[in-house]
Swiss-Prot record:
Changing R548Q: Presents 60% of the wild-type activity; highly reduced capacity to form multimeric quaternary structure. Keywords: Allosteric enzyme, Amino-acid biosynthesis, CBS domain, Cysteine biosynthesis, Cytoplasm, Disease variant, Heme, Iron, Isopeptide bond, Lyase, Metal-binding, Nucleus, Phosphoprotein, Pyridoxal phosphate, Ubl conjugation. Changing G148R: In CBSD; loss of cystathionine beta-synthase activity; impaired stimulation by AdoMet and AdoHcy; loss of homotetramer formation. In the adult strongly expressed in liver and pancreas, some expression in heart and brain, weak expression in lung and kidney. In the fetus, expressed in brain, liver and kidney. Changing L101P: In CBSD; common mutation in Irish population; loss of activity. The lineage of its organism: Eukaryota, Metazoa, Chordata, Craniata, Vertebrata. Changing K384E: In CBSD; severe form. Residues 418-476 form the CBS domain. PANTHER family: CYSTATHIONINE BETA-SYNTHASE. This is Cystathionine beta-synthase. Changing T87N: In CBSD; decreased cystathionine beta-synthase activity; increased aggregation. The gene is CBS. Hydro-lyase catalyzing the first step of the transsulfuration pathway, where the hydroxyl group of L-serine is displaced by L-homocysteine in a beta-replacement reaction to form L-cystathionine, the precursor of L-cysteine. This catabolic route allows the elimination of L-methionine and the toxic metabolite L-homocysteine. Also involved in the production of hydrogen sulfide, a gasotransmitter with signaling and cytoprotective effects on neurons. Its EC number is 4.2.1.22.
Amino acid sequence: MPSETPQAEVGPTGCPHRSGPHSAKGSLEKGSPEDKEAKEPLWIRPDAPSRCTWQLGRPASESPHHHTAPAKSPKILPDILKKIGDTPMVRINKIGKKFGLKCELLAKCEFFNAGGSVKDRISLRMIEDAERDGTLKPGDTIIEPTSGNTGIGLALAAAVRGYRCIIVMPEKMSSEKVDVLRALGAEIVRTPTNARFDSPESHVGVAWRLKNEIPNSHILDQYRNASNPLAHYDTTADEILQQCDGKLDMLVASVGTGGTITGIARKLKEKCPGCRIIGVDPEGSILAEPEELNQTEQTTYEVEGIGYDFIPTVLDRTVVDKWFKSNDEEAFTFARMLIAQEGLLCGGSAGSTVAVAVKAAQELQEGQRCVVILPDSVRNYMTKFLSDRWMLQKGFLKEEDLTEKKPWWWHLRVQELGLSAPLTVLPTITCGHTIEILREKGFDQAPVVDEAGVILGMVTLGNMLSSLLAGKVQPSDQVGKVIYKQFKQIRLTDTLGRLSHILEMDHFALVVHEQIQYHSTGKSSQRQMVFGVVTAIDLLNFVAAQERDQK
């Protein structure tokens, strides 16, 4: 599968980092520090155009890459890294019938890899290739921006091989991933979930800043590294072909960096040209084609490990025959279904994949076969979609789905609380002034709204004070610099039970209502307006007052 590493972009190409030099692969020549600083890029875009030269029908002998073949495991493994690959293919028996599929539905269970996910394959391959070409040396540091699974795979390999490992991941990723990474000895840096990939605060941006500051450190860069799709071209795809005796009619895979679907699809196009490749992209991501599929007001989603706000270099969308969009509710519903009905202990993105597969495979007939990739394990999501409380809090379960006895106030509406008008601040007010206002009024937090009253985010007293103490902002800076966008929203028509679930995990919830605004063009848009801020104290005071009145 021929490929070339894209050239780095430097200087006035939108680089958000100006903090110092680093050594990138292919830029390791010796010279003076001044020469190196002049030659080496401060960051490399993860969405640079691919320069891969792979073409269907081109002989493998023309590939510039080192290729490996799947190997059977010995009875006693020399180390745990030998338990990466050779994952089982399992028939899905009940779900396919439930949704009226005529074809055979099979699952490639990638959570049987040593680290629990499909990303173990690329993590090991990137390290082995970097060792082979001399980029990675004993004592070096591996840094990687990741949604967690690649980080776990790299941390696992780093623990065995003896490298220092730093993982940079967005805040939305599960606490289980963080705990596993720490147990493997990795250092973890968290970044804002809503930061654009090309901003200095994103997981990509922070990783490159660390790369610039830490000597002998390397970003293996799953977004650009040819080892990512090569791992799947050489092993995953061959395993699928062997397990299916070369007979499959459709493959469905959810897409993150795109390495899995690119590597597998390229091999299948060569060996099994009639097989249709189906890509799964979450709503709020922009990976799918045609572009119209990506048009939505939604920008965030709960499912982890798939979807991006940029097109990774390694993703070859030309090998995908058709794209489907998936949403959080069906992802988690199908993941729970796979666990409950098939005994497959998989993660949320597996739910996305199977939810799409039961739609896409409707066109297949008896005697045909559809393979789905189940990327990771439920281990990473014990406190998320596996938890009824979390599902209720996010609105993916309804109260009536659960049978436990509820207190008298559980089904009352939030509007019963009789909330007073909220204290709000404009984004142009200074941090110092905002702190004075919050202290004077006795509040710990306040919504930040624009002149029209539309919600921009939240500011909390604690966050502002910590930012001031850390020197990230000055008292004279506008409060817009410390807006906090990771907060829970609730509506007046929601139940106090749902509010209770939110307040078990969060200090407050923002009560919002929606307005439909018509424009002079005749089009309309929906705007969220703030109605109030509710805390656990508000709920407790309401319950206590009602019970006191009843007595």
